[in-house]
């Protein structure tokens, strides 16, 4: 069997189209995943989840009392006190809702932290192929919404990479000495300024290698979206081979293109590490 370069040149436009699709999915997925991962990582790192039995019991009591008051108000409004103006009943309802908001507002960070940990556990514990199949085939049945292949692939990569980036962010933040956080508090800085000006720059330098590795993994994971027919690089290679039966040439070209893309990421990573290192 002879190696035919002409098969590669003939397929080159389709391979470039697949490469561009791969780059789009990867870039959009990583941008969205970085936002999700950064928020989840910060919440998981700085918000403790455990709730004491005492606070839980008081919360249940307050919730039960609020529900009872609302039901009592509805019964009185329809029966014995039907002549009371509606404004009075609405004022009572708003007061009860304000009480609930006051009691449970402090629980919002705890709920977010718990949900973030569940999200990370579920996504890291399931294959990305299962995730994209669920989003592309099962989710439209649940919400009655049509999702195209490109959107399903991009959203899946966002969700998948976000879980891993959250762990990268958590590890980076926890690697920073606690003394820096305490120093920021001693200076009277709010949390967001401590994170942005003191802890963030130090943690970011330590996260660069693992973030670069995650970028490469996400790029290669995009090839798995072949299962839903997205016209990325691997899918294009498969369709080309179905037409010309030149598997050696086409898969070789596909492999070289992936190596070039991952090599560019590695070079960019080395440049960023060089620019951000502390001399």
Per-segment meaning from a language model:
Residues 1-279:
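Transmembrane alpha-helices and adjacent helix-loop boundaries
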């Amino acid at each position: 069997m002879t190696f035919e370069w002409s098969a590669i040149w003939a397929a080159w436009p389709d391979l470039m189209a697949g490469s561009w699709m791969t780059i789009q999915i990867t870039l959009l997925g990583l941008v969205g995943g970085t936002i999700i991962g950064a928020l989840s990582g910060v919440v998981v790192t700085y918000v403790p989840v455990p709730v004491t039995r005492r606070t839980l019991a008081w919360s249940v009591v307050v919730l039960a009392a609020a529900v009872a008051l609302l039901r009592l108000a509805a019964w009185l409004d329809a029966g014995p006190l039907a002549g009371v103006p509606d404004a009075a009943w609405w004022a009572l309802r708003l007061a009860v809702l304000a009480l609930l908001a006051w009691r449970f507002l402090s629980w919002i960070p705890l709920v977010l932290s718990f949900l973030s940990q569940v999200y990370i556990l579920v996504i890291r514990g399931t294959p990305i192929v299962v995730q994209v199949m669920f989003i592309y085939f099962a989710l439209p049945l649940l919400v009655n919404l049509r999702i195209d292949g490109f959107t399903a692939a991009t959203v899946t990569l966002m969700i998948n990479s976000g879980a891993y980036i959250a762990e990268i962010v958590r590890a980076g933040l926890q690697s920073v000495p606690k003394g820096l956080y305490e120093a920021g508090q001693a200076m009277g800085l709010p949390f967001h300024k401590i994170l942005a000006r003191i802890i963030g720059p130090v943690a970011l330098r330590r996260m660069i290698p693992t973030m670069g590795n995650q970028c490469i993994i996400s790029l290669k994971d995009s090839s798995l979206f072949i299962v839903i027919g997205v016209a990325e690089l691997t899918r294009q290679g498969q369709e080309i081979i179905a037409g010309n039966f030149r598997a050696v040439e086409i898969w070789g070209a596909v492999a070289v293109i992936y190596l070039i893309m991952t090599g560019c990421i590695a070079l960019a990573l080395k440049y960023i590490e060089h620019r951000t290192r502390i001399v």
